[in-house]
Amino acid sequence: MDITNRQAVLKNFLGNSPDWYKLAIMGFLIINPLVFFFVSPFVAGWMLVIEFIFTLAMALKCYPLQPGGLLAIQAVAIGMTSPHQVAEEIANNLEVLLLLVFMVAGIYFMKQLLLFVFTKLLLNIRSKTILSLAFCLASAFLSAFLDALTVIAVVISVSVGFYTIYHNVTSNHSDKDITDDSGIDNQDSHETLEQFRAFLRSLMMHAGVGTALGGVMTMVGEPQNLIIAKSAGWNFADFFIRMLPVTLPVFIFGLLVCLLVEKFKLFGYGAQLPERVRQVLTEYDQQASAKRTKQEKMKLIVQAIIGVWLVLALALHLAEVGLVGLSVIILATSFCGITNEHSLGKAFQEALPFTALLTVFFAVVAVIIEQSLFTPIIQFVLQASPSAQLSLFYLFNGLLSSVSDNVFVGTVYINEARSAFEHGIVSLQQFELLAVAINTGTNLPSVATPNGQAAFLFLLTSALAPLIRLSYGRMVYMALPYTLVMTIVGLLGVEFLLVPMTEWLTQAGWISLPHITNGVAIPH
């Protein structure tokens, strides 16, 4: 039947998203300018932040780039922020964008090796509890040297590989469309697939939390860690040792949570790998091993060598993370014989939509800065007593990181703490303790939602999430035990262990106070 032009426009707007969702976005776009001009720019700013979080929460209804982008464009158009401020935020976070564009694409060209290693791991460890612990530990270790996004990209690649192998076998698809379950025609196969999805969901969440457990420990683990370390004048070893009073107890209890939720099948964990899936993966592995030519074996060896280069380059910070990723692309494609432009393009398909989304997010961050949305909170915290400041900085960082971006929150708070030190409001010792509280506050409680951790948001908006039915709400629910334990143990560490342990480490000669002058930290 014929439809009117108005109906055609409405159908095209945000595509197949539900009508109620389309109406909600339209409502936001109508209300925001009215509130900004006739009520309060501050209120309008917070409304924009909440609306953007809503688009992230509804990521499976509609990719957040479009609705979030419309809100961001309007915010710039009505004067909530300026194009210059947005460009400045993008420039400040160029390292993160380069990471997404190049590092994630670089990992794509190492998928053969990763799938080989993790398939062996999965098939040889039959205990789900031990396997979950192995994934969590591996992610934590890798995240201490690589960026968490890189690690999540690795695990996503592996999980998509597992899912594709089984789905193609059980659905008999000639076109290999892994999003279409119509080829699975019996109830048993459907139930097995659902169990396999639950199994992969739990592994992904363990790996995701593992990136937070490891990423908080070192100055290269997360982008904001590097900013905090630079402000405090710490090198790699200084940063690691100063964080230990808080990060070590959190790490131990985080692993304990991993074991308990698997053992007692809590919060959606505990799903076993179906035996039928194990058989399919085992047969695939045996066939792949039998068919593997010398040329393919050499590709695996080359990828392993490139993997060593990747870890060393990042651990020693030989170049910016994104540039290291570019070197991985060049080395892997050169020595594995991938020279076709079309083949190269596939590597960027996963990362570029998220890169665009993160750029939109920086526009929202520009609004937060322009409208001083966090200023009242920061002023309140700095008015507290020195002993209360540590816990308040930790808690407010955690709260804001859960609804905002932890890179932004960490940067804002360390700059405010640094400014307070330079103006004589806090002492040097207090500033360094605040730096620890800020770092742990931005990294630990932020696992509560995908908004705080870029790695979690990347997972939520990846091609894997809809395949394994990993929604925003399910991620929050499955992260809950980790969130509670990591936040509470981290708070107790900041409250009771940080000061005495730092004093003991200083007396033992493990750490020394830097001399900070003219805005530059210079270790003795």
From Swiss-Prot:
A GO cellular-component term linked to this record: plasma membrane
Domain of life: Bacteria
Catalytic activity: 2 Na(+)(in) + 3 H(+)(out) = 2 Na(+)(out) + 3 H(+)(in)
Record has Cell membrane as a keyword: yes
Keywords: Antiport, Cell inner membrane, Cell membrane, Ion transport, Membrane, Sodium, Sodium transport, Transmembrane, Transmembrane helix, Transport
Membrane topology: Multi-pass membrane protein
A Pfam family per the record: NhaB
Cell compartment(s), UniProt: Cell inner membrane
Record-level Gene Ontology MF annotations: sodium:proton antiporter activity
InterPro entries for this protein: Na+/H+_antiporter_NhaB
Record's keyword annotation contains Cell membrane: yes
Membrane-crossing residue ranges in chain numbering: 13-33, 98-118, 140-160, 239-259, 304-324, 325-345, 358-378, 448-468, 479-499
Physiological role: Na(+)/H(+) antiporter that extrudes sodium in exchange for external protons.
HAMAP family: NhaB
Family: Belongs to the NhaB Na(+)/H(+) (TC 2.A.34) antiporter family.
Protein name, per record: Na(+)/H(+) antiporter NhaB
Species whose genome carries this gene: Yersinia pseudotuberculosis serotype O:1b (strain IP 31758)
